A protein has these predicted regions:
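P-loop NTPase Walker
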Residues: 1-123
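Gly/Lys-enriched N-terminal cap/neck module of very large, oligomeric protein machines
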Residues: 105, 122-137, 145
Length: 146
């Protein structure tokens, strides 16, 4: 699977682009659980929540009234699906996503790397009980004291 990276400045439509790409991937297969193989990473918790909300909102639109979604035409064309087939896939994917919400991986870059580090903790010689220190003040104080 390819790694797609999108970079853009504030207000340039990143959420729209990422939502479209997420939907394109999630609906590219008849497997309604395919969303669980997608990893979307962004910088802030606010952006993460906004992206999750937008993806669910658009999946709902595609599942209930596809003509109301700005992505409907583009997805039917790109995925080579009839509108009714796209709607069916959206219904099944939305249901699967809501029933297995913990597998809906849209996260911040720090939580992504925290998961990566945890998965290699044993190989790195650490216990799995690692925590991320966001406040740099205690870290600086500790460095000065040593």
């Amino acid at each position: 699977m390819a790694l797609d990276i999108y970079t853009a400045s504030a207000g340039s439509g990143k959420t729209h682009t990422l939502t479209r790409e997420y939907l394109r991937l999630a609906l590219s297969t008849p497997d309604p659980h395919y969303f669980s193989t997608i990893q979307a990473v962004t910088f802030t918790k606010k952006a993460t929540l906004e992206m999750k909300e937008r993806i669910v909102q658009e999946l709902y639109r595609l599942a209930t009234e596809p003509d109301a979604s700005p992505f409907s035409g583009e997805l039917t064309e790109h995925l080579h699906l009839f509108p009714t087939k796209l709607q069916e896939r959206a219904q099944r994917a939305l249901r699967a996503l809501l029933l297995d919400y913990s597998s809906f991986r849209v996260r911040t870059i720090d939580s992504f790397f925290q998961e990566v580090v945890r998965s290699f903790a044993h190989e790195l010689g650490h216990s799995g009980a690692l925590r991320v220190q966001i406040d740099s003040k205690p870290l600086l104080q500790s460095a000065v004291l040593e």
